[in-house]
């Protein structure tokens, strides 16, 4: 299920737009995640108290975490499917410490696609959307495999 060179180029092209404002994009992704799937908010002790979108937009901690999430994802995407070294510690922490189910990774993948579509429609046409969907699915499948190795049934 790997991506072609052309598909990776589409993914990295739009990701270049994201990197111009990782914190802003990340904050918007997390807000969409929490609004669309409020149950995910319960996994974040630091953000549980944020109930409204305005509270979320005003949270520097949320913005910082959004930056962290998208920085890590960008590092993985740039590996073009050769992300073993980057995935192992991420899977370890998300399985054993944070206990994040794979389903939640699907939810955040959807939120990422929605943010990219709304902020960068010119760089995120159907072909780029398909490529990003494949890249994020590859990431989730690899995380799920690592979870299984760790004995986490997320």
Curated annotation (Swiss-Prot):
Query: What name goes with this protein?
Result: Myoglobin
The biological process GO terms on file are:
removal of superoxide radicals
Q: Which residues carry this modification: Phosphothreonine?
A: 68
- Tell me any Pfam family this protein matches: Globin
Q: What is its EC number?
A: 1.7.-.-, 1.11.1.-
Residue positions annotated to bind nitrite are 65
Tell me the residue numbers annotated for binding heme b: 94
Q: Hey, what's the signal peptide range on this chain? A: none
Q: Name one GO molecular function term.
A: oxygen binding
Which positions does UniProt annotate for O2 binding? 65
């Amino acid at each position: 299920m790997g991506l072609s060179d052309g598909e990776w180029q589409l993914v990295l092209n739009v990701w270049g737009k994201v990197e111009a404002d990782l914190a802003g994009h990340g904050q918007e992704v997390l807000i969409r995640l929490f609004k669309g799937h409020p149950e995910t908010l319960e996994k974040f002790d630091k953000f549980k108290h944020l109930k409204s979108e305005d509270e979320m937009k005003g949270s520097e901690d949320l913005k910082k975490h959004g930056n962290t999430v998208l920085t890590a994802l960008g590092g993985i995407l740039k590996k073009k499917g050769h992300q073993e070294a980057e995935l192992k510690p991420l899977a370890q922490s998300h399985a054993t410490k944070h206990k994040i189910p794979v389903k939640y990774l699907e939810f955040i993948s959807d939120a990422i696609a929605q943010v990219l579509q709304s902020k960068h429609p010119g760089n995120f046409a159907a072909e780029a959307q398909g490529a990003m969907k494949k890249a994020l699915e590859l990431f989730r499948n690899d995380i799920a495999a690592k979870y299984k190795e760790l004995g986490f049934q997320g």
